[in-house]
A protein has these predicted regions:
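Aromatic-rich peripheral "rim/lid" segments of glycoside hydrolase catalytic domains that contact
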Residues: 310-364
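Hydrophobic h-region of N-terminal signal peptides that target proteins for export
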Residues: 11-19
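Positively charged n-region of N-terminal signal peptides that target proteins for export
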Residues: 1-5
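An active-site-proximal structural segment forming one wall of the substrate-binding cleft
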Residues: 49-52, 58-68, 85-113, 120-156, ...
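N-terminal carbohydrate-binding accessory modules
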Residues: 19-68, 83, 291
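Surface-exposed, active-site-proximal loop segments in enzymatic domains
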Residues: 41-47, 75-91, 115-132, 314, ...
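Active-site region of glycoside hydrolase catalytic domains
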Residues: 130-275, 282-306, 328-331
Length: 364
């Protein structure tokens, strides 16, 4: 009788251990690209949306050496205001995932923009309105319901792109509840979690990682120096500078800087306080590398890149330094982006030098 009771006790303990320690999956990636302005940040619908990204694109990306796609999706494209699914958008998403499987690419579905949260919006109700938080968790329940049949070794989820909360704890609380919500449905799915304030390296130390979860991936974005990577970008606060930029070293030559007057001088002299080079980038990377090592979790740079207007030679030197550091610290990454303003395709033409730097594949 005592022996039987002991066996029952052991079985119960084993079951409890199984619940508290989910199995580590085999999701692993290295070189990817963002499929932007398709199911995210676009007003295009119907046939024009369908032909923007096709099987031929996935085949091309596989052939030139990428091993995964980051697929940004927006709430307004995937879900109607009443919360019901937009069938056409989900059909396109499933098409993309099936093409990835066909051409042996892995995928990350990134919930990019919510009706309650845009990374550049002034008001972000997600952090202050409990109803919006519940709606966010419900979106993930529906996404999980739709996507759970894909292998955990093939597909990962990114909770949300570039959170921007007034207080770091607001985002930490949402991360904890969102992870719990998904884990009830999918205990072994890889989930990507980034820090508050645009997933910057500067705020990584404030991110609270849910404990005892081996299938989390720490994500950050890197666009420094911003004046170089977003050179003349019309939606940014650096759009007014039209002079030359340089990398590495001082971003603006002293000779060019002295020609700026008044507020323009004060604004852009800031960028010359640091001579930007590989050593500076490595110092920034070390912050996220050390954080990931502390938590014994893989690290992923989900966005990095230079806009098309950035001078080619300076852009290529920046990319070369970035890639060398990614490789040195074994950081998986996805370039921003494919066909957009930072794209490896410009006006339909593959940027062969950039592709070679990103993947090591010469397609000339």
């Amino acid at each position: 009788m005592e022996k039987k009771a002991w066996l029952i006790c052991i079985c119960c303990l084993c079951c409890m251990c199984g619940v508290s320690a989910p199995k580590k999956n085999n999701f692993s990636v290295k070189r990817g690209v963002n499929i932007s302005h398709w199911l995210s940040q676009s007003n295009v619908r119907g046939e024009n949306r369908a032909v923007f990204f096709t099987e031929a694109d996935v085949k091309f990306l596989s052939e030139v050496g990428f091993d995964h796609l980051r697929l940004p999706v927006d709430e307004e494209q995937m879900f109607a205001p009443d919360g019901s699914k937009e069938k056409e958008a989900f059909s396109l998403l499933h098409n993309a995932l099936s093409w990835c499987q066909k051409y042996r690419l892995k995928a990350i579905v990134d919930l990019h923009i919510l009706r309650s949260h845009h990374f550049n919006a002034k008001e972000k109700p997600l952090f202050t309105d409990r109803k919006e938080q519940i709606r966010f968790y419900d979106l993930w329940k529906q996404l999980s319901q739709e996507l759970h049949t894909y292998s955990v070794d093939f597909l990962a989820y990114e909770l949300m792109n570039e959170p921007v909360a007034d207080d770091h704890e607001q985002w930490n609380n949402i991360v904890a509840e969102c992870v719990r919500t998904i884990r009830l449905l999918e205990p072994e799915r890889s989930l990507l979690v980034g820090s508050n304030r645009w997933q910057g390296y500067e705020t990584m130390r404030y991110l609270k990682i849910p404990e005892n979860d081996p299938n989390l991936i720490i994500s950050f974005h890197y666009y420094n120096p911003f004046l170089l990577t977003h050179y003349r970008a019309g939606w940014t606060d650096v759009k007014d500078y039209t002079g030359k930029v340089h990398y590495p070293g001082k971003l603006i030559a002293d000779e060019d800087l002295k020609h700026l007057k008044g507020e323009l001088y004060d604004k852009f002299a800031y960028w010359n306080k640091v001579e930007f080079n590989k050593e500076v980038i490595e110092k920034h990377f070390k912050e996220v590398v050390d954080f990931a090592r502390l938590h014994q979790l893989p690290l992923y740079c989900g966005e990095f890149g230079c806009i098309a207007a950035t001078p080619k030679a300076d852009k290529e030197r920046w990319y070369q330094d970035m890639i060398e550091l990614f490789d040195k610290y074994e950081i998986a990454r996805a370039n921003w982006d494919y066909k957009g303003g930072f794209g490896i395709i410009e006006q339909g033409i593959p940027q062969t030098d950039l592709i070679y730097m990103l993947t090591g594949r010469n397609i000339k």
